[in-house]
């Protein structure tokens, strides 16, 4: 099955503490989760590893969000949108369901 949300897509968070925030997807996980740039930040307690030159301390990093909690952002309408698939020139492409514009 083709992925409706892919890496480098601009998405908007639908639920949770970061509801309404926009960001770019940096990674799509096989478990049905995505990591969005600057969203769902958590603090991780990092142990120092002198052999690798890693300094210890409290580090902020992005945690995964379930795919169902984000929606692709349509810049033309300024809202979250749903994604459909169609064939153009024998290629399967994604498009926004609200205005039928092809997603690049």
UniProtKB/Swiss-Prot annotation:
| One BP term from GO | translation
In terms of PROSITE patterns, this protein maps to: RIBOSOMAL_L24
Q: Where is it found, in Gene Ontology cellular component terms?
A: ribonucleoprotein complex; ribosome
MF GO annotations: rRNA binding; structural constituent of ribosome
Query: What keywords does the record list, in alphabetical order?
Result: Ribonucleoprotein, Ribosomal protein, RNA-binding, rRNA-binding
* Lineage top rank: taxon: Bacteria
Q: Record's family?
A: Belongs to the universal ribosomal protein uL24 family.
Its biological purpose: One of two assembly initiator proteins, it binds directly to the 5'-end of the 23S rRNA, where it nucleates assembly of the 50S subunit. One of the proteins that surrounds the polypeptide exit tunnel on the outside of the subunit.
- Subunit structure and binding partners: Part of the 50S ribosomal subunit.
Q: What is the protein's name according to its record?
A: Large ribosomal subunit protein uL24
Query: Which organism does this sequence originate in?
Result: Photobacterium profundum (strain SS9)
Q: Which gene encodes it?
A: rplX
